[in-house]
């Protein structure tokens, strides 16, 4: 299964494509779509759409994992973020991909075992789980990869008809997480 994770933003949009097969997780591609602040918002949305479409065409994901909207005190920022999300949703529908949305707390819980984890903790666990180091220096990328991982972990949980210990919403302790991912333990 291949999933495209998207961390939307009006100036930087993170993306990460993760494959899960019998040998585990692997990153097919990841990065940040950097948008020039001098361009109109409509031009930036068009750029996001086109660049993500190229990524979809080259990596062939079956699903898109998108971060849900968070409440913002700045209405203008929230509207712009909503428009970026709309472009990603439209692209998902136009390319016949399943779209799944996850709240930041749900992603944090799936990847670290704690819904209140910091960005640093999420980045650490994402790079460990995907066995990538060094070249990922942006939280936009680790957040997008975390979204893809969250989706893949949720698929696995649904397929097994019972949540894996330490990953489900109900079990937020490290013991359950270590049982679910023994290969992550450094001895």
Swiss-Prot record:
Binding site for Mg(2+) 2: 67
Annotated family: Belongs to the RuvC family.
Organism: Chlorobium phaeobacteroides (strain DSM 266 / SMG 266 / 2430)
Localisation: Cytoplasm
Needed cofactors: Mg(2+)
Role: The RuvA-RuvB-RuvC complex processes Holliday junction (HJ) DNA during genetic recombination and DNA repair. Endonuclease that resolves HJ intermediates. Cleaves cruciform DNA by making single-stranded nicks across the HJ at symmetrical positions within the homologous arms, yielding a 5'-phosphate and a 3'-hydroxyl group; requires a central core of homology in the junction. The consensus cleavage sequence is 5'-(A/T)TT(C/G)-3'. Cleavage occurs on the 3'-side of the TT dinucleotide at the point of strand exchange.
Catalysis: reaction(s): Endonucleolytic cleavage at a junction such as a reciprocal single-stranded crossover between two homologous DNA duplexes (Holliday junction)
EC number(s) given by UniProt: 3.1.21.10
Superkingdom of this protein's organism: Bacteria
Protein name per UniProt: Crossover junction endodeoxyribonuclease RuvC
One GO term describing the cellular component: cytoplasm
Cofactor binding, note field: Binds 2 Mg(2+) ion per subunit.
GO molecular function, one term: DNA binding
Amino acids binding Mg(2+) 1: 7, 140
Subunit structure of this chain's protein: Homodimer which binds Holliday junction (HJ) DNA. The HJ becomes 2-fold symmetrical on binding to RuvC with unstacked arms; it has a different conformation from HJ DNA in complex with RuvA. In the full resolvosome a probable DNA-RuvA(4)-RuvB(12)-RuvC(2) complex forms which resolves the HJ.
Active site as annotated: 7, 67, 140
Keyword tags: Cytoplasm, DNA damage, DNA recombination, DNA repair, DNA-binding, Endonuclease, Hydrolase, Magnesium, Metal-binding, Nuclease
Signal peptide feature range: none
GO biological process: one example: DNA recombination
């Amino acid at each position: 299964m291949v999933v495209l994770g998207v961390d939307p933003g009006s100036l930087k949009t993170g993306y990460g494509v993760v494959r899960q097969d019998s040998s585990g997780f692997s990153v097919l591609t990841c990065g940040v779509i950097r948008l020039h602040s001098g361009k109109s918002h409509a031009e930036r949305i068009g750029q996001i759409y086109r660049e993500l479409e190229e990524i979809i065409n080259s990596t062939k994901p079956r699903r898109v994992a998108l971060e849900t909207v968070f409440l913002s005190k700045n209405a203008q920022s929230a509207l712009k973020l909503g428009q970026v999300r709309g472009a990603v949703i439209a692209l998902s529908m136009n390319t016949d991909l399943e779209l799944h949305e996850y709240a930041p707390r749900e992603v944090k819980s799936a990847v670290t075992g704690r819904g209140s984890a910091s960005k640093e903790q999420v980045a650490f666990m994402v790079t460990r789980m995907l066995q990538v180091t060094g070249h990922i220096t942006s939280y936009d990328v680790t957040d997008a990869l975390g979204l893809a991982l969250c989706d893949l972990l949720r698929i696995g949980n649904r397929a097994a008809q019972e949540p894996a210990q330490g990953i489900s919403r109900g079990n937020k302790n490290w013991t359950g997480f270590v049982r679910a991912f023994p290969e992550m333990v450094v001895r």
